Amino acid sequence: MNKQNKKIIYIGDNRSLYTKYQCTSAPSVIFIAGLGDSFEIWKKVQDRISDVTSTLSYTRVGIGSSSVTAVPQTCHDLVEELSELLQELDVKKPYILVGHSFGGLIARLSASLNPLDICGMILVDAAPEFKELAYEQVLPENLVAGNREYLENPSLNSENIDKMQSYKQIVDHSRQTDLPLTIIARGLPDSGEEGWPSQKILEIEQNLQAEFKKLSTSSKFRIASHSGHYIHHDEPEIVIEEIILMLKEIEKALN
């Protein structure tokens, strides 16, 4: 296979997922995008990592060329979707999961539910559970109601995700492991609607992401100083570097 091996894969209930799969060796690096993003968001990083090991990126149900769903989904549903896809493609185990934004929640829950299949995890400006509630500490009063509605109403996000239920699933299955874990947080504030306290929100998110270190006894935290939320676009070399470092560490541990 080559780097341009893009195809639609059908999983249970005839759902279709648009994928980009490069099969070479194990471990396989699995890229999990944030809400509303297709697999193309990983292009710069995936193409480089495909030179050294197997990689898979995919577009979830409800986005782009993948199937559409009208039913609210939870993080657990998306973990099952990924598991079915990995099985259908017979992707080589074990896996390093690389999750961006909401994709970080999918990676975390997948690692909790399938610990024997996962050998490492990299969180790229990953969404902390219940982050919207933390925002309320610094939001002006006129933005609190809209922020809470976005948290509680699945129809307001791009994939019809039940965030409240998803966050509860993360909390219920959270436990400390010794899984190699790298956390990369953005260093620049993102622009929001008028009155949005971008710098204060950045500080909250960096602090919450630093707490991810407690998820593993083998964790590291890094800030991408020149990146906004899309670190894999702004500074792809950082994500590439951390994946390659983890691959080397895993190889060393196995030998």
List where the protein language model places each region:
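Alpha/beta-hydrolase
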Residues: 32, 58-60, 124, 185, ...
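Active-site nucleophile elbow and catalytic-triad environment of alpha/beta-hydrolase enzymes
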Residues: 155-173, 204-211
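Conserved hydrolase catalytic core segment
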Residues: 92-130
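Conserved HGGG/HGGXW glycine-rich cap/lid loop of the alpha/beta-hydrolase fold
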Residues: 15-65
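N-terminal cap/lid segment of alpha/beta-hydrolase-fold proteins
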Residues: 1-16
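Catalytic active-site module of serine/aspartate enzymes centered on a nucleophile-bearing elbow/loop
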Residues: 219, 225-255
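Active-site loop/oxyanion-hole signature of alpha/beta-hydrolase fold enzymes
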Residues: 12-13, 20, 57-98
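Flexible "cap/lid" loop of the alpha/beta hydrolase fold
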Residues: 122-159, 192, 196
